[in-house]
C-alpha cells in the first residue's frame, strides 16, 4: 500500500494519525455503488447494516449481483479502501479501519432521479459520509447533473443530516481526460455540496484520465500509466486486488481520511470539512502546468485542487477547530443583455460587486450562464476575481458538437476560497468556432457563498480562542445598503487575443517536459501550539502568551506570515511572529494568511495511449490500463447491458 507508507511527503500522511490512535472510530461511511459484499472477511467486522440498503432490489441486503465476469465488483473495492479490517492478514488495511462501512446498491439497474435521491438520503442522521465514484458519461460532450429529487436530497443532507451538522458527500471528479472532458460539466462534482476529489499518480503526475476543472477541491493517489502502481483493496468472492484504478479509487481514500478527521472532532460540519481540506492539502510533489497562487496565498490547480490530502494535518486541525460562521449567499445579476459572440472572437464582461451581505470570506463562487451556441464545444469561459485569481470555468471540448448550449448552468470555482468578494469580476467568453459558428450570451450572474471573517482554530490546550465583538476580523464598515448596487461593462472585439489555456493538462505535450516552476504555498492553519505534536494534550497555560504560531503539518514552513489589508488598494504585508502575536491582540483591518512552502518540481512524464471504443451514460470511475474493456449502466429505463466481456470496474470513474 505504497500510497499510505512511502514517507518523505510522498504519501497521504495517514500513519502518524494511526499512531495517535485515530482510526475513524465512531464515523460511518456509506458507498453508493453497485453493491457491497458484506461477508467479505476484510469487511464483515466493520459492516454496518444501518448504513446499507438495496435500492435496486428494494430490500435491506446490499450484496452485489454475481455474474461470470464479476461486473458488480466496484462497490466492494471502494469499501475496502475505506474500512478494510486491521491485523487479520487478509487483503489490505482501510484508511479508516476503525470506522463502520455500509453500501447502497443503486447502480445495478435503472439509475433514475428517484434512485439517486433515495440513495443520497439514506439514514442521514446515522451516516456521516457518502462516497460516490460514478457520474454522467465522461465522453467530453455530455452536460448533466442531479435532477430535482437528487438536488433536494443534497440540500436536505447538508442542512439536516448528522443532526444539523450536514452530511458529507465525497465525489470522484471523473475520468474524461482522454476525451478532453471538463468536470464543471458534471453537476455532481460541480455542486457546492460535494467534496470533489481528483487523482495523482505515484510519481505526482496528472493521470491521463484526469479531468481538469475549477470545482476540484483536492486529490488523493491512484493509478497512472502502464507500469505505475495502483490501489490495493478488497474484491468480490472474498478475494483481493491490487489493480483498483481511476478517480473511483481516489474518492474512497478521501472518504476514509475525512472519517479520521471526524473521529478527532465529531462536531465538524460539512463546511468545516471542506475548509479543513483546503487548509491542509499539500501542493508539493504534485506536478501540473497550471499551479497558481490565489489572492490569499493558497496554491491551487485545476488538476489537483489545493493538493494532496494530508490525513495527519487534517486530524490535528480538526481537534482544535471552531465551527465556521453561518453560510451566506448573494447573487449579483448582470444587466439584461443579449450579446452575440461571433466566431473567432471574445466577449469580456465586468461586474462590480460592492455589496454582498454576510459574505466577507468566499468559499464557492458560481457563474450562472445561459448561452446559445452553434457548437458548444467551441466555447472557452474564464473568470477572474478582484484579487486576480483567474480560473477556467470551461475549456474547449473537441467532441461536444451540441447546439444546446447552457441553460442557467452553474459553473463553479473553489479557487477564490478565502478571498474577498468585493471589487471587479471579469468574465471572458471565447468562441473558437468556424466562420458560421456563432454563439449568443443571453444572461449571466455571479452567486457567491461564504461567511463573515472568523478565526477557526483553538489554543494549544484545546480551549477555544475567544474574540470579543470589537476585535473581530474586518470590522464592519459603515455603508449604505442599496439593492442592486453593481455595474456591468461590456468590451467586445472580433480579434481573438492570444491566450494560454492551462485548464486541460495534456501530458503528451512535449513542451511540458522538464518544465520547472517554483510554487509557494502559504499553508493556512494558524494553530497556536507549544509543539506540533501536542495540540490537545498540552495543559501548560502559563506559556499561552509565549507560544509561537506554527503550521499543523509536518512539512517545512518559513517563519514569515503575511497579512492582507482592507485598504484601497489592497496591500500585502509581511509579518514576523512577534507582529502576529501583537496582531491577535488588536485585530482590526487585516487578515492573516499563511506561511510559505516551496514544493519540488520534476519533469512531466508523458502517458501511454489507451484505446477506448465505448461511450457511457452512467458509469463507475475506475480505470484498468491492462484491459481495454468497459461495461455500462444506462441512466435510462433500459436494462443495463454488458458492452464487452470484462468486468464493469475495468473502465469508468
In which residue ranges do the predicted regions lie?
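Subtilisin-like peptidase catalytic core
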Residues: 11-14, 26-27, 31-39, 45-156, ...
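Mature extracellular/periplasmic domains of secretome proteins
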Residues: 16-24, 68-72, 93-96, 110-132, ...
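Extracellular S/T/G-rich loop segment that most often corresponds to the catalytic His/Ser-adjacent loop
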Residues: 33, 186-263, 267
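C-terminal subdomain of the subtilisin-like protease fold in secreted/lumenal serine endopeptidases
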Residues: 122, 127-131, 166-167, 193-196, ...
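Secreted peptidase-domain scaffold signal
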Residues: 174, 300-379, 440-516, 522-523, ...
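Beta-strand signatures of extracellular beta-sandwich domains
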Residues: 380-384
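Noncatalytic modules at the cell exterior or secretory-pathway interfaces
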Residues: 419-429
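Short beta-strand-plus-loop segments that form exposed binding edges in beta-rich domains
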Residues: 428-436
